[in-house]
From Swiss-Prot:
Recorded name of the encoding gene: pepQ
GO biological process: proteolysis
GO cellular component, one term: cytosol
Family listed: Belongs to the peptidase M24B family. Bacterial-type prolidase subfamily.
Protein name: Xaa-Pro dipeptidase
Function per UniProt: Splits dipeptides with a prolyl residue in the C-terminal position.
Cofactor needs: Mn(2+)
Binding site for Mn(2+) 1: 257, 339, 384, 423
InterPro entries given in the database record: Creatin/AminoP/Spt16_N (IPR029149), Creatinase/aminopeptidase-like (IPR036005), PepQ_N (IPR048819), Pept_M24 (IPR000994), Peptidase_M24B_aminopep-P_CS (IPR001131), X-Pro_dipept-like (IPR052433), X_Pro_dipept (IPR022846)
Swiss-Prot/TrEMBL catalytic activity: Xaa-L-Pro dipeptide + H2O = an L-alpha-amino acid + L-proline
SUPFAM superfamilies hit by this protein: Creatinase/aminopeptidase
Source organism, top-level taxon: Bacteria
PROSITE patterns found in the cross-reference section: PROLINE_PEPTIDASE
Length: 443
């Protein structure tokens, strides 16, 4: 297997090429990319957890260090000023020496405000990309060159196409997340609370709560009907019925985003519905290929949802086509089939149709879909269908012409289980689709 160092060398070459093209197009000399800064809680001296600028960690796997700066021009070796203060109050990361440091010039930056004296004197034609525009102004960057939309759109568009280095990192993140999911299922089977299941997950993945790429969704029973449930009850419920876990991991700044759902019992209607959603999810992935719109796969899954609603007699006396046409599947799967994945969990450029940033919105019928792209080789996406029993979405259907088609008794029986979601992370290749999650044998 090719080493991470050689993959990274090629990755940097790709980023340099993209940078040259962007600088030429937008008539800039270089980009100054800021890792970010710590921000204190209001009226306090305690900072919020640091989250690095995604455009910064695209270049270097430095995710925990604020006040760092990258200068890139697409030609010369990228220059990294790495924040290295003399500080006995806080942990100070040492100057990095790793697989990637041969391809980047790494320079110690002892003072956060010392970058100004180290940058080129002529800065009028340098673009700043980062979260603190006032810092850029202090450095003499032109206001029009601070987070220039055209440059960011261009870089975002091409971030959709992962390099081999990025895919290698994402496969490592998958391994960590899969370990966590196995530990969490074991904790669920042993009767633990949501809080303790989360601890088991974090321990297995080697993450802190602030390290995971998004807040873990650890939902027992009816909590699985809350799409982004993050409360974490300390007390286990008296009766364990179901468990939905949506939790990821991060490796060198790249995310995994997996979801699994388990039934406490294997012989009830809910357990069969979990199995059927899983089977339909795999069947959809088996049809995926480059050159097809992601929207088409979302619509196709609503047809599969209709099939399951009919099979389980949740909707009766109506054809599957009529269910989809009249959006009776909508309240059961109110979110999109998935989203782009990469340096960010909901990765950028999901609606971008070209490198000029042309936007194609989600269909009006499915406004929460996060991607309208034609699938192309190098893209990484989640496929995460679900079926839920959410009263606020079902309530409008209790009246009107379609109410009689809903098996309300069956729905009431399933509501205590909350819902179901199954999520894998897939890579689009020229002639196949790689399922990174199932390749690790996560059922």
């Amino acid at each position: 297997m090719e080493s991470l160092a050689s993959l990274y060398k090629n990755h940097i070459a790709t980023l340099q090429e993209r940078t040259r093209d962007a600088l030429t197009r937008f008539k800039l000399d270089a980009l100054l990319i800021h890792s970010g800064e710590l921000f204190n809680v209001f009226l306090d001296d305690h900072p919020y957890p640091f989250k690095v600028n995604p455009q910064f960690k695209a270049w270097v796997p430095v995710t925990q260090v604020p006040n760092c700066w990258l200068l890139v021009d697409g030609v010369n070796k990228p220059k990294l000023w790495f924040y290295l203060p003399v500080d006995y109050w806080h942990n100070v990361e040492p100057l990095p020496t790793s697989f990637w440091t041969e391809d980047v010039e790494v320079i110690a930056l002892p003072k956060a405000d010392g970058i100004g004296s180290l940058l080129p004197a002529a800065r009028g034609n340098i673009g700043y990309i980062g979260p603190v525009p006032e810092r850029a102004l202090q450095l003499g960057i032109e206001a029009s060159n601070i987070n220039p939309k055209g440059v960011i759109d261009y870089l975002h568009y091409y971030r959709s196409f992962k390099t081999e280095y990025e895919l290698a990192c994402m496969r490592e993140a998958q391994k960590m997340a899969v370990n966590g999911h196995r530990a969490a299922e074991e904790a669920f089977r042993s009767g633990m609370s949501e809080f303790d299941i989360n601890i088991a997950y974090l321990t297995a993945t080697g993450h802190r709560d602030t390290d995971v790429p998004y807040s873990n969704i650890v939902a027992l029973n009816e909590h699985a009907a809350v799409l982004h449930y993050t409360k974490l009850d300390h007390q286990a419920p008296e009766e364990m019925r179901s468990f939905l876990l949506d939790a990821g991991a991060e490796y060198n700044g790249y995310a995994a985003d997996l979801t699994r759902t388990w039934s406490a019992k294997s012989d009830n209607d809910y357990a069969q519905l979990v199995k059927d959603v899983n089977d339909e999810q795999l069947a959809l992935i088996a049809t995926m290929k480059a050159g097809v719109s992601y929207v088409d796969y979302h619509i196709q899954f609503h047809q599969r949802i209709a099939k399951l609603l009919r099979k389980h007699q949740i909707i009766t006396d109506m054809s599957e086509e009529a269910m989809v046409e009249n959006d009776l599947t909508g309240p059961f799967m109110p979110h999109g089939i998935g989203h782009p994945l990469g340096l960010q969990v909901h990765d950028v450029a999901g609606f971008m149709q070209d490198d000029s940033g042309t936007h194609l919105a989600a269909p009006a019928k499915y406004p929460y879909l996060r991607c309208t792209r034609i699938l192309l080789p190098g893209m990484v996406l989640t496929i995460e269908p679900g079926i839920y029993f959410i009263e606020s979405l079902l309530a409008p259907w209790r009246e009107g012409q379609f109410s009689k088609h809903f098996n309300w008794q069956k729905i009431e029986a399933l509501k205590p289980f909350g819902g179901i979601r199954i999520e894998d992370n897939v890579v689009i290749h020229e002639n196949n689709v790689e399922n990174m999650t199932r390749d690790l044998k996560l059922a």
